[in-house]
Amino acid sequence: MQYKGFKPYPFQRGIIDDILNKDDMFYTMTCGRQIGKTLLLINMLLYYGINKPKSTLLWVSPFYSMGVKVLSEIIDAIEDSGIVNEANKSEKIITLINGTRIYFRSAEKPETIRGLSIDYAFIDEAQDVSDDAFNKSILPTLTAK
């Protein structure tokens, strides 16, 4: 997997290969600071969004400001690529031309996650997401399908 602008470092390549070659429900990373975890996660989100048509994906950031930043970065990176059908910053949803919908939510307000049925969830900085937010809001969206 290599898209314009993203060339994984060897350790990232190992993580990507591990994720793509397994069918596990959960995959977690424990890594040092400032080594590209969020960038790797963004690229995995886009990989699944592009390669799993009509999927529903969820990006969860522990804090609202982090989620808005990631949403803006992704829109800036892909808006002219031809893969975006609609990017709604106010609703925090990107819809791709293949029917995939990507929701961006914050664990600060887990009630905004409830009610969604998600195929794949991507949780950035998961150590800052409360057990309550994960167990009562995020996990049920994955098991609803």
Predicted regions and their residues:
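Phosphate/NTP-binding elements of NTP-utilizing enzymes
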Residues: M1-K145
